[in-house]
């Protein structure tokens, strides 16, 4: 609703998300939650429902706004608001919802869980991966396929520098 105020055309963004998914591209959607701008339950629910209609397996990252650079009038996004956004995403049927950019302050919303058995698959702290249990794109506990782009476990996490 407020996207137009920023000079964007929301329909173009939504159409592009649908088109890219239909073409087989891997998508992860990030929503910067800005107090008083796009943090209402209705707006967050609309985003989550839109994504879930395309695929419940599209990861949705809700991130906190910080008063930086030129946009300094709204308050920073509170932890409670970010957690509410994540809960809305989960309640609307999204399998992979993350609350980001507030490391150690969003509980388990940094981690990836199996939608089949709820096992912890990827443990994170901020942008650091502490452990990844996904093997061959599957949950090691129940065998459910976990959508994403996964590397083989025998490859180094960081490529050697030249």
What is each residue range found by the language model?
Residues 114-117, 139-142:
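Short cysteine-rich clusters marking metal-coordination/redox-active sites
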Residues 128-140, 154-162:
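Short cysteine/histidine-rich metal-coordination sites, predominantly Zn2+-binding motifs
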Residues 79-89:
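Short alpha-helix
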Residues 123-124, 148-149:
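Short, non-ligating residues that shape and space the ligands of small metal-coordination modules
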Residues 99-105:
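Acidic carboxylate-rich catalytic motifs and surrounding loops in phosphoryl-/glycosyl-chemistry enzymes
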Residues 120, 145:
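Cys/His-rich metal-chelating microdomains
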Residues 109-111, 136:
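Residues immediately within or flanking Cys/His clusters that coordinate Zn2+
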Residues 1-80:
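Conserved AdoMet/S-adenosylmethionine-binding subsite of the radical SAM
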């Amino acid at each position: 609703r407020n996207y137009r105020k920023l000079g964007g055309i929301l329909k173009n963004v939504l159409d592009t998300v649908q088109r890219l998914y239909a073409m087989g591209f891997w998508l992860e959607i990030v929503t910067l939650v800005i107090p008083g701008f796009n943090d209402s339950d209705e707006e967050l629910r609309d985003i989550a429902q839109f994504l879930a209609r395309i695929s419940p397996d599209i990861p949705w990252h809700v991130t906190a706004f910080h008063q930086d650079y030129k946009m300094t009038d709204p308050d920073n996004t509170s932890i409670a608001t970010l957690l509410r956004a994540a809960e809305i995403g989960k309640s609307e049927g999204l399998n992979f919802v993350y609350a980001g950019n507030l490391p150690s302050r969003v509980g388990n919303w940094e981690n990836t869980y199996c939608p089949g058995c709820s096992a912890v698959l990827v443990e994170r702290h901020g942008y650091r991966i502490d452990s990844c249990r996904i093997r061959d794109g599957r949950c090691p506990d129940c065998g459910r396929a976990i959508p994403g782009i996964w590397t083989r476990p025998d490859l180094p996490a960081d490529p050697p520098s030249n």
